[in-house]
Amino acid sequence: TFILFTAMSPEAGGLGFDAMQNGWVFAFIGLMGVIIQGGLIGKLTDMFEMNKLMILGTITCGLGIASIPYVPSEMSWLILLSSAFISIGHGLFSPTQSSLLTFESSRKGHELGVVMGAQEGYGALARIFGPLLAGYLWSLTVEGSGFWTYHTCFRVAGLIFIVAALLQLNLIKNSELSKTITRVE
C-alpha cells in the first residue's frame, strides 16, 4: 500500500511518485537499515536494555507507517521522515527481538532452532497476511470519504503496532516475573 499511496495522483491525495522516485525512497530505507543494523545497534544495546529498544522500535515503526498518508504532496520529501521512522524502528526491533528470543529460549532450555524457526515462520505469515489485509482495506476505502478513506489501512497498521507493543510489554513483564520466581525458588 506504500507504493499505492506514493504513486496515487496528488489530486487524489497521494504523492504522484513515479517508479524512480519510489526507488529512491526504498534506497533511503535500505541505507537507514544498514546504518542502524550495521553500525548503531551494537552501541545502542550496550547503552540501553534490549527489551526497551525492541518496544521503542515497534512504536517508532508504527508511527512511521501510520504517518504515511498524512504526507502532503506539496511537501512530498516528508515521506523520507516517515520512511526513516519505519526503517529505524525495524532496525531496532528486529535484531533485539531475535536476541531476546535467543536468550529466553536458552534460559528455558528450549531448542534454539525450533524457536528461531517459529520466529521466521510467524514473520513469513505476517509478510503474507499483512499486505493482503492492507490491500483489501485499501480496495475498500480508497474511494471512500470521511473516516473510511485510503488512510484506513495505515491507521489499522498503526493500531496493530500498538497492540504489538502492548503484547511485548506484557511478555517482558511476565518474563521478569518468571525470573523473580526462579530466583526465589
Enumerate the predicted regions with their spans:
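Hydrophobic core of transmembrane alpha-helices in multi-pass small-molecule transporters
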Residues: 76-93
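Intracellular juxtamembrane helix-capping segments at the cytosolic ends
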Residues: 92-108
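A membrane-interface helix-boundary motif in multi-pass transporters
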Residues: 18-20, 136-161
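Multi-pass alpha-helical transporter architecture, strongest
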Residues: 68, 155-185
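Loop-to-transmembrane helix entry
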Residues: 11-32
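C-terminal ends and interior cores of transmembrane alpha-helices
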Residues: 59-73
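Helix-to-loop junctions at the C-terminal end of transmembrane segments
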Residues: 35-50, 138
